[in-house]
Design a protein with these regions (language model features):
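Basic, helix-initiating cap at the start of DNA-binding domains
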Residues: 1-29, 34-42, 59-62
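Short, structured helix-loop boundary elements
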Residues: 8, 15-16, 36, 58, ...
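Short hydrophobic/aromatic patch on the recognition helix
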Residues: 44-54
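Hydrophobic alpha-helical connector segments
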Residues: 63, 77-107
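Short, basic, alpha-helical segments at the C-terminal edge of helix-turn-helix-like DNA-binding modules
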Residues: 66-72
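Short secondary-structure transition hinges
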Residues: 102-141
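Conserved small/polar residues in nucleotide/adenosyl-binding loops
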Residues: 144-151
């Protein structure tokens, strides 16, 4: 019998690889042009394994977007803890916000490109909002966390 902790660690590593590879492919080729088979090959996992993690391409696309935004916001929070933003004067908050936008443009162009591609894909695939509920709620949690520290 396999060690449950080791198994979970392997699954987490495989999931991380899938998300990272999918992000790279989606940015390089656009979401529409990338198949689940392309992702499975590039991530060196079987198609069945990929579909066990993400039963549909839309679920993977949403997971990639949520993961990338979480990583970006975590990095931003590491540079200046979001909880400390409310402790600074309004002008410094404005500077922090502008610096964040500039940093994103200069250092996170792939995320911006992916985000634009994500919006187009979701809009033009005719997906209904029910399929995006988890994604919107994850963004809502991040947004609420940020807004809670502005006042």
């Amino acid at each position: 019998m396999r060690d449950p902790e080791k198994l979970k660690e392997e699954m987490d590593e495989r999931n991380r690889k899938i998300l990272d590879v999918a992000f790279e492919l989606f940015v390089d080729k656009k979401i529409e042009a990338v198949s689940m088979g392309d992702i499975a090959r590039a991530a060196d996992v079987g198609r069945a394994t990929l579909f066990r993690y993400y039963p549909s391409k839309l679920e993977l696309v949403i997971a990639v977007c949520a993961d990338q935004w979480k990583r970006y916001l975590d990095g931003l929070d590491a540079r200046r803890p979001i909880s400390s933003v409310h402790d600074i004067p309004a002008i410094d908050r404005l500077i922090f916000t502008m610096d964040s936008y500039i940093d994103m443009y200069q250092n996170h162009k792939a995320l911006l490109k992916y985000n634009d591609n994500f919006n187009y894909y979701v809009t033009h695939e005719g997906k209904n909002n029910d399929q995006l509920v988890d994604f919107h709620s994850s963004l809502s949690v991040s947004y609420t966390h940020l807004r809670a520290h502005e006042t």
